[in-house]
Amino acid sequence: VNQQRTAQDGTDALHATASRKAAFRLLPILCLTYFMAFVDRTNVGMAKTSLEADVGISAAAYGVGAGIFFLSYALLEVPSNLIMYRVGPRRWITRIAVTWGLLCSCMMFVQDELSFYVVRFLLGAAEAGLYPALMYTVTIWFSQKQRVTVVGILYLAVCAGFALGAPLGGALMELHGAGGLYGWQWMFLVEGLLTVVVAYFVWRLVPDRPEDAPWLTAREAAVLNDRAVVRSAPGHGTLKGNVRIAFARPFILALSLIYFANQVSSVAIQYNFPSIVESLDVEGAFLIGVVSGSAGIASFIGVLVIPWIQRRVRNEVRVLTYVTVATVPVAIAYSVSDGAVLRILLIDAAMLLLVGILPLYWSVAMARMSGLMAAAGLAFINTVGLLGGFVGPYLYGLAEGRGSESAGYAVLVGAALLGVLLLPVLHRTVRSEDRRAGQEADVGSPAGAEGAR
């Protein structure tokens, strides 16, 4: 017994060392990649008013263009991640970053509503698969116990993108007139090229798997592979079998729909917050960016606090439920408020909840999938959420184009209520999934196998 305990302690120490190496080597570049994704998403919100003035894009057309990014992203999400599974995360994340960076720079050539739609659609197609590819990379390198923390760190990059992207975009827009370009053209050009630079570092620094990492010993790579394994499912040896199972498992569908409701609200806020701030008589692109960045700071706090609460409660589904319910009174309060400061604070509170909860969605999913099925399942969840990213800005822009603020508020309140109504379904399907996994574990154990005989 003592020898077994000593061996286990040695394995735990080896895993801790290998995990620290992986975190130190991989998380900075993965976070930087995700940071740039949200800087590039924030910039179109910063450019909204300028695009309307300089190019003649209407509020309704802006809503369509902002959302159409998510439509093409959603259409290509699953194919993108199945390719990623074949070629490896390193090659595919690099490809994604290069193409989305170049197309982000191409936003500077937008001349009318049609070209706005086309570039936004292509931009979504280029970026399709980024987030599930990052999540899949996490499942390869980190154990289930570590993943909620690692995903939380990635979401800190999202918050940093929100918090710093708007002021950065505002600062670049102050270059208005330099070289004969509008300020928004400078913003898209510079931020797109920065993304291409980040892609180079992904190619150089991110191995596909632990055994490919020159900075790990063979024993360290082996222990990372061993601890990263989570329970699988029947049919994981075939592509068709995994896709069918991932799409048919009820807990995946329930989680996907709640994530959809979350994204309707959060993306509508993300793409319209700078113009909301401007409508509250805040002047100057940089100052508008600074005030808009408050939503990123609130999101940062949420990503720190909500996973911390989950670690204390040790029940991610329960915490997910509480936070989802809390979004309803915040959305209602925003819809009836009229003070500028209060409205900004309520938007910040909404983003704290909506973004802070995101690591829990992925923790619930990753605990119950592995291998190719994880690649397909995570992509499916993200795809459904991306459809929410299309619906939210589209409905909000449609309401704004008709001069109806109350209809825009109804989008946020309705999405919050939808998430709450779906919670009982999630609870039921997760319990069913866990019972199924427990039964499979019993059958796979020596005692279970003996009983089966």
Positions of predicted regions on the chain:
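Conserved MFS/SLC helix-loop-helix module at the cytosolic interface between two early adjacent transmembrane helices
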Residues: L75-L114
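Helix-to-loop junctions at the C-terminal end of transmembrane segments
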Residues: L76-P89, G302-N315, E400
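Cytoplasmic helix-loop-helix junction between adjacent transmembrane helices
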Residues: V119-L156
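Glycine-rich segments within core transmembrane alpha-helices of 12-TM secondary carriers
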Residues: T149-M173, L194-T195, N382-G392
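C-terminal transmembrane helical hairpin of 12-TM major facilitator-type secondary transporters
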Residues: R314-V364
